[in-house]
């Protein structure tokens, strides 16, 4: 597995070693040992999968403590633009984001540590999206930001009139209005490799 650092410390792209032959391909999608050595120690406790069509945008979501989550995400079928936004007060990259295209062809994975809002938009006719979380889903701790907050300057690569949102995702606050954010100093130690 190759680790590609991004402009925001702790947010990484993971490129697996792919073995191809005339039968197809094989790759190791996750190794606890290698992830701990190259990224950081994490104990994933829940795997989720979603199916969506072109233009569906899910996000920008996060969970507040004590159920804050790190996520390791990837695409099984299709293509998405995946986005992580730094919402850690006091962070040198507060309000900045990293975006990466995840596809069934590139097999890339995207690691989003705690302290980030996460979302993705579907770029192909259909997508099957999978993600690992290091904490359980807790609806009472849900938080979210507006996907179209101009301060975030996210180019979603899909025209705004083609974006499909859930009812809930249509009414989130902008970052400057957010009533709750993560504290950078309390999270910095868990974003470092062991």
Predicted regions and their residues:
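Short beta-strand His + acidic residue motifs that chelate non-heme Fe in jelly-roll/DSBH
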Residues: 110, 118-123
């Amino acid at each position: 597995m190759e680790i590609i650092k991004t402009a925001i410390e702790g947010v990484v792209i993971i490129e697996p070693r792919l073995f191809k032959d005339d039968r197809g391909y094989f790759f190791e999608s996750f190794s606890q040992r290698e992830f701990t050595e190259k990224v950081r120690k994490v104990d994933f406790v829940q795997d989720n999968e979603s199916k969506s069509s072109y233009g569906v945008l899910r996000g920008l979501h996060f969970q507040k403590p004590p159920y804050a989550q790190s996520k390791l995400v990837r695409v099984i079928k299709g293509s998405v633009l995946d986005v992580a936004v730094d919402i850690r007060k006091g962070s040198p990259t507060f309000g900045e984001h990293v975006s990466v295209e995840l596809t069934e062809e590139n097999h890339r994975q995207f690691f989003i540590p705690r302290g980030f809002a996460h979302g993705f938009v579907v770029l192909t006719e259909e997508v099957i999206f999978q993600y690992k979380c290091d904490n359980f889903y807790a609806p009472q701790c849900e938080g979210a930001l507006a996907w179209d907050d101009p301060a975030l300057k996210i180019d979603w690569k899909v025209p705004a009139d083609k974006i499909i949102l859930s009812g809930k995702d249509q009414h989130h606050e902008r970052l400057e209005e957010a009533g709750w954010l993560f504290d950078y100093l309390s999270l910095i130690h868990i974003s470092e490799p062991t």
